[in-house]
Amino acid sequence: MKLPQAFYARDTRTVARALLGKVLVHLDGGVRRAARIVETEAYHGPDDRASHARAGPTPRAAIMFGPPGRAYVYLIYGTSHCMNVVTGPEGFPSAVLIRAAEPIEGCLHSTRGPGNLCRALAIRREHDNGRDLWGEELFIEDAPAPREAVVTGPRVNVGYAGPWAARPWRFALRGSAWVSRPAPAGARAARAPAPAPRPRRPRGSGP
């Protein structure tokens, strides 16, 4: 069952935790590509200095000010896409970055790290930015609550955000081999299968 809009219309930190264990699905030309979410980051409100919303509703970040349950997909360094979910009440800019997932089916690439995840599921800004997440092509399916414990830590590569850099708004499933590096303390207890060679994960990928 697809998650309804009401799921996303909550505090972004609540949604970031609740998304762990859910299944991100992209129907790419009729091919189902799916992965279980194991790591997220919350970007909360206009005062969050790590968020794109800190500069107001710019052409790139305007979608964060819109209704919840929309995909916010942007390009970094001209090469990698990042998939976010708009959350909270409309007008309060917030989003959850999906940092990593465990591959389930149809994945084209490693799913560890936000750029890799979008590459694996063929999610692209030009096709998917602004989509609602209860449609027919890009959506998140409900799943049982994860058995793994949730660990938290600071978000990745947001040192420029001053005191906001230390907020423990990164969430991951303990023991998942697919959590991106550096993992939150205690998050990694296994090694993922060796992926095919891939570009280095871009830095500073949050919305």
Curated annotation (Swiss-Prot):
Top-level lineage group: Bacteria
Molecular functions per Gene Ontology: alkylbase DNA N-glycosylase activity; DNA binding
Species annotation: Anaeromyxobacter dehalogenans (strain 2CP-C)
InterPro entries per record: Formyl_transferase-like_C_sf (IPR011034), MPG (IPR003180), MPG_sf (IPR036995)
The protein's name: Putative 3-methyladenine DNA glycosylase
CDD domains in the record: AAG
Stretches with biased composition (Basic residues): 198-207
Membrane spanning stretches: none
Coiled coil: none
UniProt keyword annotation of NADP present: no
Pfam families documented for this protein: Pur_DNA_glyco
Keyword terms, alphabetized: DNA damage, DNA repair, Hydrolase
Region annotation Disordered: where it falls in the sequence: 182-207
Nucleus keyword on record: no
Biased composition (Low complexity): 182-193
GO biological process: base-excision repair
The EC number(s) this enzyme carries: 3.2.2.-
Family stated for the protein in its record: Belongs to the DNA glycosylase MPG family.
